[in-house]
A protein has these predicted regions:
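Acidic phosphotransfer microenvironment of two-component signaling modules
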Residues: 24, 45-49, 117
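Hydrophobic/aromatic residues positioned on beta-strands within the core alpha/beta folds
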Residues: 93-94
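Active-site residues of response regulator receiver
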Residues: 65-66
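Non-catalytic signal-transmission and effector/linker regions of two-component phosphorelay proteins
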Residues: 1-18, 111, 115-139
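Two-component/phosphorelay signaling modules centered on CheY-like receiver
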Residues: 23-42
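Acidic, metal-coordinating helix/loop segments flanking the phosphotransfer/catalytic sites
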Residues: 43-61
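Conserved phosphotransfer cores of two-component systems
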Residues: 55-57, 80-88, 99, 104
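Short amphipathic alpha-helix used as the core "switch/output" element in two-component signaling
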Residues: 49-52, 72-86
């Protein structure tokens, strides 16, 4: 006999997060904290690697440094997310102020250096508010 488990009884799927950062230590630290919080993390050392990940699998959140020195920067990755991946939460990080452009919107901005736990907390709050919105019949 086949038993079917109601969807409500299934454990929640882990949030899939791309961390695009060219500074190795920053990327590793953010990824480690997010993994410790139960998120599934994919690392990219530049914008092009981030775009490649997005082309191969669905993700929930993209966190990108704006200024990366090699092969596509974070701004290119952010524009790709907004153009090709509607519904993905976009988090920008930089030591400088966020760019003011009419063609780019983002969901959060963190000024470097930032505690990686702040991003983990933001993702959890975002997920909770999105789930509450959907359950209310408004989403």
């Amino acid at each position: 006999m086949i038993s079917v488990t109601p969807e409500a009884d299934l454990p929640p799927k882990p949030v899939k997060v791309v961390v695009a950062e060219d500074e190795v230590l920053v990327r590793l630290m953010v990824a480690e904290v997010l993994r410790g919080e139960g998120f599934q993390v994919f690392e990219a050392s530049n914008g092009q690697e981030g775009i490649s990940i997005l082309k191969t699998m669905p993700v929930d959140v993209v966190i990108t440094d704006l200024r990366m020195s090699s092969r596509a920067d974070g701004l290119e990755l952010a524009r790709y997310v907004r153009t090709h991946c509607p519904g993905i939460s976009l988090v920008l990080a930089s030591a400088q102020a966020p760019p003011i452009t009419e063609d780019l919107t983002f969901d959060a901005f963190f000024i470097k250096p930032y505690p990686p736990e702040d991003i983990a907390n933001w993702i959890r709050r975002r997920r909770t508010s999105t789930r509450d919105h959907a359950e209310s019949g408004l989403g």
